[in-house]
Regions:
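Short beta-strand-centered aromatic/proline hotspots
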Residues: 88-102
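Mixed-charge, low-complexity intrinsically disordered regions
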Residues: 1-72, 81-88, 126-200
């Protein structure tokens, strides 16, 4: 599934990878079931990422909160701390464009790819996100025998200046550059660590 990640061509890129190894395949299989539940509960990602991180909410094509397993065509609204955008609900928006699962005896994985998009509750198709729609975030969880990993690859990250006012451009550049330099990596490392963490 790693070959599903779009080629990096422009802007910044980053990755966060967290791994955990178990003593037996059976223990790894059991824990991966927990990891899957966490991963597929998008509305709880902020709990796993830690304090003062972005809030993620899974939504349908009307922009309404949903509690289902994510699928292609669903939206995710993102509430960025400190610097909300000027849209009416202050959310950043991404859309799920790829969802795949793979399961074999010694290997299983789930892959989700999202891309900045418009607000589904607005009439315009203007991208409502601090990053340009060329950017993608690629989320993996996988079990390879006794090893479990959670991985996030952020690709082609450039600020979104499409049809923006000067103040919006400044805001998007500030948030995007902050994310490129340190924010996104801290956000994603918190999430990957939280997704695979052993329960006490």
């Amino acid at each position: 599934m790693i070959n599903k990640i779009p080629k990096h061509e422009i802007g910044a890129e980053s990755k966060a990878i967290s791994k955990i190894v178990f003593d037996t395949v059976e223990l790894a299989k059991n824990h991966f079931e927990i990891v899957k539940k966490r991963f597929l509960d998008v509305n709880s990602w902020e709990l796993f990422a830690g304090k003062n991180k972005a809030k993620f909410t899974l939504r349908n094509q009307e922009g309404e909160l949903i509690l289902n397993q994510p699928k292609v065509g669903n939206y995710i609204s993102i509430e960025v701390p400190l610097l909300p955008n000027k849209d009416k609900d202050h959310f950043e928006w991404v859309k799920i464009e790829v969802y795949e699962e793979e399961k074999k005896e010694d290997y299983e994985a789930i892959y989700i790819r999202v891309r900045p998009t418009s607000n589904p509750t607005n009439a315009t198709d203007e991208t409502v996100h601090f990053l340009d729609s060329k950017a993608t975030s690629n989320f993996f969880i996988r079990r390879n025998e006794m090893e479990i990993s959670a991985e996030i690859y952020a690709i082609n990250e450039i600020p979104n200046f499409e049809d923006k006012t000067i103040s919006e451009k400044i805001r998007n550049k500030a948030v995007a550059l902050g994310g490129m330099l340190f924010g996104s990596k801290l956000q994603w490392e918190g999430l990957t660590d939280g997704l695979i963490r052993r329960e006490k």
